[in-house]
Amino acid sequence: MRLSSHGKKTVSTSNNPVFNRIGLFFTAAILFALFLQMLFFLRPWQDIKETKVYTFQMDYRQVLKKVDLKVGDPYWRWAGQGQTINRRIKNDSMIRSLSLRLSKNGTAIIRVNENLTAGFVQIKQKWYRMDQNAHLSSKSIQPDGKTPVYTDFKNGSKILKKTITAYLSMDKVMRLAVAQIIYSPVKSSPNRLALVMNDGNLVYANPSSLAKRMDLYPKMVATMEEKGIKNGVIDLQYGGYARKFENSDDNLLSSLSSDKSKSSSKSSNSSK
């Protein structure tokens, strides 16, 4: 105890052991709470037990390989590593960004924001990858067989962009079933598309209704089989009906075959 300048008595706490102990106790409690929080965040006793990868096109194994994340990895290695994995895929042309979340049960959840592949376009006997915005790759690359090739479209045209949007809106099973998309306008249908399917059928549709109408495709194929038609035309422009190939359809397909043979012969000649 001491006297103030006004003659009043004051209590000094700087050397008071009781107050010092209380301050030390609260400091220790805060540090211990932070330690526990860090411990439960890193979970050094736990491993990654399961991985879940959400993609639109990419195979989940591709993503895990690029990130180098595996079941059995220590939990702490991946805790709070969202920015780290994004640095790993910074120059990857297929991925825009990744998000990583770890659940308390040891599940690593990865969500992928992809640069989608809409298909491939041939220019001067070289193939180029086309993304969801109709932008072409700077380097030539062979089609992957998982997305269609686009024929007779003008680069960057509205009809091309609408077609890409419609194609990417289709169910995954149906997207994989399409081998080629042709811009095939006729007087009665100026926006007509012709889709060459992997099963040998030809589909006519419009970009505005393509994604919705393609859901009818399996039923229409079944109808064709009931009629004894192995391969034919499924017209989805104004409803949905199936028929046999006609001369106009054969001419369309034969012209495509002719173009392919010409381009292949040119490329073989240029390589000699």
UniProtKB/Swiss-Prot annotation:
Q: Which BP terms from GO are recorded?
A: FtsZ-dependent cytokinesis
Which terms are listed as keywords in the entry? Cell cycle, Cell division, Cell membrane, Membrane, Transmembrane, Transmembrane helix
| Superkingdom in the source lineage | Bacteria
Matching Pfam families, A to Z? FtsQ_DivIB_C
List the ranges whose topology is Extracellular.
Answer: 43-272
Cell compartments where the protein resides: Cell membrane
Q: Which Gene3D superfamilies match?
A: 3.40.50.10960
Instruction: Provide the membrane topology annotation.
Output: Single-pass type II membrane protein
POTRA domain location, by residue? 43-115
List all membrane-crossing ranges. 22-42
Family affiliation? Belongs to the FtsQ/DivIB family. DivIB subfamily.
Tell me what this protein is called: Cell division protein DivIB
Record organism: Oenococcus oeni (strain ATCC BAA-331 / PSU-1)
